[in-house]
Amino acid sequence: MTGRALPLSARSGFWLGVMGAALLIGAYLRLEQIAIQVLIDDEWHAVHQFITRMPRDMFLDFGYADYSIPLGILDWYQAQWWGVSELTLRWPMLVCGLATLVVLPLYVAGPLGRPTAAVFALLIAQSPLLVIFSRMARPYAITLLLGWIAHGAYQRYSPGEHAIRHGTARGQVAAGATYAVAAALATWLHPVIGPFVAAPLLWGLVQVRDVPPADRRAALLRWLALAVATGALTAAVVLPPLLAHPLSLAAKGGIDAPDAQTLLGVWYAWFGTPATGVVLACLALAALGFPQVWRAIPAARTGALGLLLTFLLVAATGPMWSHLPVTISRYLLPIVPLLLLAVAAGTVRLAERIAVPPTGPRRALALLTMAVPVALLAVASPLAPLLRRPNAQTQHLVNYIDFRPDHNPYVPQFAAMPLSPFWADLAARPPGSVRIAAAPFYFESYDWDAPRWERLSTQTVVPGYLTGLCVDRRAGEMPRDPRYRFANAVHLADADDLAAKGIDFVAWQKPYLLDVAGHSAPIGADTASCEGVLREKFGAPAFEDSHIIVFSVPHRNRPAAHAPR
C-alpha cells in the first residue's frame, strides 16, 4: 500500500506522530491504576507454588493449575531478593505489553506502509484483551510477543534461495538463535503456544522443496540445524516436568471442548467489543485487508498456520474451560494482532479508494475513514468502565469472561449474592476517601463481589486476610512473612498493617446460601467461626444487617471512622 492517494504522504511524519500517540494511549491504558490492583483468579496459581515449593520442585512440575514454571521460579527468587508485591508479579507482562506497542507497528511499517502501521498501532493500543493481559500476572502477554518475534526471526533465517545466496552468516545465526530462544521460552512459559511457535519450521520445511536443486541440500541442512537447536532447547525445559509429572498436563485434558457458541463468542473477545455490528464491520475490513497482509508479510502466513495448529491441538485435547470463549481467545491470543492488522490494512485500502479522484473533500473523507474502526472499537469498548476511580478490581474475571453482558455468567451469579445497603450509602462520601478491607476473600472471583461493592460505594475495597487471626492458612491469602509485601491486601490480625494501609473499615460478609439457576451452594461456611474473633478484636460493629458486619478501625492519632447508617 503506497498511500499515494491519501491526503498525507505515506512517508509523512504525521503517521509517526499517530504511532507515538498510540504508544501513549496504550501505555496509559496498561498502567492506569496498576499499582492498586488486587491479585485475583489465575494470578494466584504461581503464588500458591512459590510460597510452598522450591525452584527445583517447580522446574519438575507443570502443576495441575498451570502456573507457568519460569514465572513461578522468577517469583520465588524475587521473594528472596527484594520481596514480592502485586507489581513485582506483573512487571514482566507489563514490559512485554508495552514493548508490543512498539515492536509490532514498526515491524509492519516497512512492508505495509506508515498509514497502515499507524492505524494498527491505535487498534492494538486500545485492544481490551491486550490491555487486560498486559496487566495480569499470567504469561499471555509475554508469549504473544515472543511468539511473533519467533515468526519474524525465522523469516530472517529462512532457508530459502535468497537467504542462502545473500544472507550474512552473522545475521542468519543471530536470527536463528532469536527464533530458537523465543520459541523455547514461549513454550516453557505456556505449553499451548508450542504449535504456534513451531509453525515456521513446518512452513520452512515445505519451502525447501522450492529451492533450486543446487542449493537444496544447503537449505535442508540450515533448516535441520535450526530445528535441532530449537528442539533441544525446548526439550531441555519441557521434558523434565513432562517426564517427572506427566499427569499434570494430562489431567487437564478431555474435560471440555469448544462448541458453536464458543466459536461465535471468541470474535467479540478478539475484537474487544460487545457490539455485533462492530464485530461485523471489523470482519468486513479484515477480509478486505487480509490478502494484502498475506502477500506482504511472510510471518502472517506462518502465524496463520500456527494458529490453525494451536486450535486443532485444543480441539483434540479438550482442556478444561475450553467451552468458554475467553479460554479459546487467550489460547489463540496471537490472532488479535493479526486480525487488527488486517482491519488496519483493509481500512487504508478503503480510504485509498475513497480518495480517488484526489479532490479535497474525497481526501478529507478518506482520512476520516481511517479513523472509523478505531472510533467504533473505542466507543463500544468494555475498557471504559474500568477507568472509573477508584477501581482496584480491573483484573476480575467479570470484566472480560465475556464482553457481552447477556452472555456473561458472572452477571446472574452476582445478582444472586446478598447485597447490603452499606455499600451504596458510602457513595455519599468523596470517591476514594474510604478504604475497606473485606473478608472473607475468595481468590476465585466468582465468589468475590468486590467489583459491585466498589462501583456502588465509589470507595476502595481490598481483601482482608484471615490467616493468623482465625485460620492457619487459606488459599488466596499470603502468609505473614516479610518477603511477601502485597500492597492491596491486609492481614486483619496485624494492627500495624491495618494502619499502614489506611484501612477505615473491616467488612465481614456473613455466610449465605447462593442459589443460581437452581443450584445452591453454601458460601462462607468454612470461615463462619471467624465472626466471633472479629467481634472480640474490633469491638462493637459500626454497622450490621442481615448480610454484613462492619467494624470501624481506629488508628493512633485518628478516631474511629463512622459507618453510614
Model-derived segments and spans:
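Hydrophobic C-terminal alpha-helix "anchor/cap" residues
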Residues: 2-4, 78, 186, 426, ...
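Membrane-interfacial, low-structure loops and terminal tails that flank and connect transmembrane helices
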Residues: 1-12, 159-173, 210-220, 352-364
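Alpha-helix C-cap/termination motif
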Residues: 110-111, 353, 357, 429, ...
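Start-transfer (signal-anchor) and selected internal transmembrane alpha helices
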Residues: 1-28, 109, 297, 364-371
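Membrane-proximal helix-loop-helix interfaces that form the catalytic/acceptor-binding platform
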Residues: 18, 23-161, 172-352, 377-399
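Internal/C-terminal transmembrane anchor helices
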Residues: 362-386
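Glycine-rich, flexible loop segments associated with nucleotide phosphate handling
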Residues: 16, 167-178, 215-223, 327-331, ...
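Extracytoplasmic
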Residues: 382-565
